[in-house]
């Protein structure tokens, strides 16, 4: 099949210069207890999750990644504490430093800021409608304030009240958050207070009560879960971009900081299943999430979760999915360091004029199985072939893409690029890219050739 088209989009230098700089991830949750199979890689059973030396090393590695904020998901589980509690028994050997103390100490050494959790009173299913659970969380807060309120790394409180914001936050959720907040302000007046709710995918932004309920909250920061890892919709990223902007408009009126909690994980088996392990998402998906949060007006980006999804190669304490957690680390650090490939991908995700992660976007050009070539408008700088990767629908990028140029009557191969291959693609839709740089000047014609194995969606950009 032969298809001849002109370039869909030419990005000029001025257009590229106007693109925002994507916010990096500057905070992450710390996950201490092994609760279920979801934590297979974030807190492996084969590693002592209470080892203070291990946590000191991991905090140092996270600092190298640019983390400024550490958020304890919980500091107790099943009525055992990960800190020297007098309220409950300890979840670590009594003859050594607690994991909470080790993390706080290393965080202080690196100038990092820690949000202390008030959970769990019992376990990950704490129900604040139960007076005993609510009372124990307040008792824990009081004890933790006495132990760490003056610690140089203590920055504030994370309230593990992950109520659903959609379609509208309930009165009970508002009251539960505000009750904990009131006690936190009495104990630690200068501490920042943060929640990280879910449910923006089905939030009713048109209901005036939605904004009113947010305005009633007395917290300092709402770090919304972007729910891309949880895959609450078939194609969640395009609508997320609009929802961030709607939330930004609300937060401009409330004075509450709007942070993004960009989920870095995919699922080894089924989604949202406690018997399915969290695994690293392909980096193009995660980069698109960061770009969406930036463009939508988030003030900071944190992530559930860095430790276990990203792992430094050669770490003294290896953690995460073999190979893929190290690759996630290398890809993120390459982007952070200004790698040309990932910066080009970032430009794509920040552009409003290109197709995104949805098969129904009319800008995609669909190709069936077979060999294809398309003639494109010549350009002297960079040519990007964007490709939708939606394995769950049988839509995958070509195995390789070749660029040919014609200057003096003959087609000459310029370069062949093999798109990166990803393993953890069972549930997501994201955009991959093949990027050609150093295109020879003076080409009269250019064409791209590729072979499609199943079905491919392609879009071409030049600059």
Regions found by a protein language model. Give the residues of each.
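Active-site groove signature of glycoside hydrolases
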Residues: 119-125, 140-171, 302
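Aromatic-lined carbohydrate-recognition surfaces of secreted/lumenal glycan-active proteins
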Residues: 115-127, 131, 158-162, 178-207, ...
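Aromatic, loop-rich ligand-recognition surfaces of beta-strand-rich domains
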Residues: 360-415, 430-463
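Aromatic-lined substrate-binding rim segments of carbohydrate-active enzymes
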Residues: 52-121, 172-193, 237-242, 246
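Substrate-binding cleft of secreted/luminal carbohydrate-active enzymes
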Residues: 226-233, 256-342
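Aromatic- and acid-rich polysaccharide-binding/catalytic face
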Residues: 152-165, 198, 207-238
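Boundary/entry segment of secreted carbohydrate-active catalytic domains
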Residues: 21-68, 73-76, 199
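An active-site-proximal structural segment forming one wall of the substrate-binding cleft
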Residues: 94-110, 128-156, 213, 293
């Amino acid at each position: 099949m032969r298809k001849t088209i002109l370039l869909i989009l030419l990005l000029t230098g001025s257009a590229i210069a106007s693109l925002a700089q994507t916010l990096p991830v500057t905070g992450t949750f710390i996950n201490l207890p092994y609760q279920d199979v979801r934590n297979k890689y974030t807190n492996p059973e084969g590693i002592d999750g209470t080892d203070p030396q291990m946590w000191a090393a991991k905090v140092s590695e996270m600092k190298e990644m640019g983390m400024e904020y550490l958020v304890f998901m919980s500091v107790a589980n099943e009525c055992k504490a990960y800190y020297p509690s007098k309220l409950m028994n300890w979840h670590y050997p009594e003859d050594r430093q607690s994991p909470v103390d080790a993390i706080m100490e290393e965080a202080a050494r690196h100038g990092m800021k820690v949000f202390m959790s008030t959970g769990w009173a019992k376990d990950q299913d704490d129900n604040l409608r139960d007076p005993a659970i609510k009372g124990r969380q307040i008792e824990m807060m009081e004890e933790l304030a006495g132990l760490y309120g003056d610690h140089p790394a203590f920055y504030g409180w994370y309230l593990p009240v992950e109520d659903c914001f959609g379609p509208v936050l309930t009165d009970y959720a508002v009251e539960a958050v505000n009750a904990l907040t009131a006690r936190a302000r009495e104990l630690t007046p200068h501490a920042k207070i943060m929640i990280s709710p879910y449910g923006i995918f089905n939030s009713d932004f048109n209901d005036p009560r939605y904004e009113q309920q947010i305005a009633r909250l007395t917290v300092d920061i709402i770090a919304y879960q972007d729910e891309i890892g949880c895959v609450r919709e078939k194609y969640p990223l395009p609508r997320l971009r609009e929802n961030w902007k709607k939330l930004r408009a609300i937060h401009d009126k409330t004075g509450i900081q709007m942070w993004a909690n960009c989920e870095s994980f995919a699922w080894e088996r089924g989604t949202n299943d406690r018997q399915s392990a969290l695994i690293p998402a392909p980096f193009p998906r995660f980069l698109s999430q960061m770009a969406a949060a930036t463009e939508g007006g988030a003030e900071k980006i944190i992530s559930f979760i860095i430790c276990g999804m990203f792992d430094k190669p050669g770490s003294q304490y290896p953690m995460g999915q073999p190979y893929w957690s190290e690759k996630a680390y290398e890809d993120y650090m390459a982007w952070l360091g200004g790698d040309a490939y990932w910066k080009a991908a970032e430009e794509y995700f920040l552009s409003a004029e290109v197709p995104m992660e949805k098969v129904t976007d009319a800008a995609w050009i669909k190709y069936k199985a077979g060999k294809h070539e398309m003639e494109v408008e010549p350009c002297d700088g960079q040519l990007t072939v964007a490709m939708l990767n939606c394995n769950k629908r049988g839509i995958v990028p070509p195995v390789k893409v070749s660029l040919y140029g014609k200057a003096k009557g003959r087609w000459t191969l310029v370069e062949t690029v093999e798109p990166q291959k990803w393993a953890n693609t069972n549930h997501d839709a994201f955009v991959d890219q093949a990027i050609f740089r150093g295109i020879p000047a003076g080409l009269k014609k250019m064409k791209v050739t590729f072979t499609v194995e199943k079905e491919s969606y392609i879009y071409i950009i030049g600059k």
